[in-house]
């Protein structure tokens, strides 16, 4: 059970840092 919780927590936390550079590039393009 702890393995499943940590794995799901990793999946939830992973997209945030991964998408941060892309959103930054999009903001620079808009400006």
From Swiss-Prot:
GO molecular function, one term: electron transporter, transferring electrons within cytochrome b6/f complex of photosystem II activity
Membrane-protein topology: Single-pass membrane protein
InterPro entries to which the protein is assigned, alphabetical: Cyt_b6/f_cplx_su6 (IPR007802)
Subcellular location: Plastid, Chloroplast thylakoid membrane
Residue spans crossing the bilayer: 7-25
Keyword Transmembrane assigned: yes
Keywords: Chloroplast, Electron transport, Membrane, Photosynthesis, Plastid, Thylakoid, Transmembrane, Transmembrane helix, Transport
Chief place of localization: plastid
Highest taxon of the lineage: Eukaryota
GO biological process: photosynthesis
Signal peptide range in chain numbering: none
GO cellular component: chloroplast thylakoid membrane; cytochrome b6f complex
Function (record text): Component of the cytochrome b6-f complex, which mediates electron transfer between photosystem II (PSII) and photosystem I (PSI), cyclic electron flow around PSI, and state transitions. PetL is important for photoautotrophic growth as well as for electron transfer efficiency and stability of the cytochrome b6-f complex.
Family listed: Belongs to the PetL family.
Subunit structure: The 4 large subunits of the cytochrome b6-f complex are cytochrome b6, subunit IV (17 kDa polypeptide, PetD), cytochrome f and the Rieske protein, while the 4 small subunits are PetG, PetL, PetM and PetN. The complex functions as a dimer.
Name the UniProt record assigns to this protein: Cytochrome b6-f complex subunit 6
């Amino acid at each position: 059970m702890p393995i499943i919780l940590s794995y799901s927590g990793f999946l939830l936390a992973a997209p945030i840092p991964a998408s941060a550079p892309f959103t930054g590039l999009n903001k620079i393009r808009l400006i």
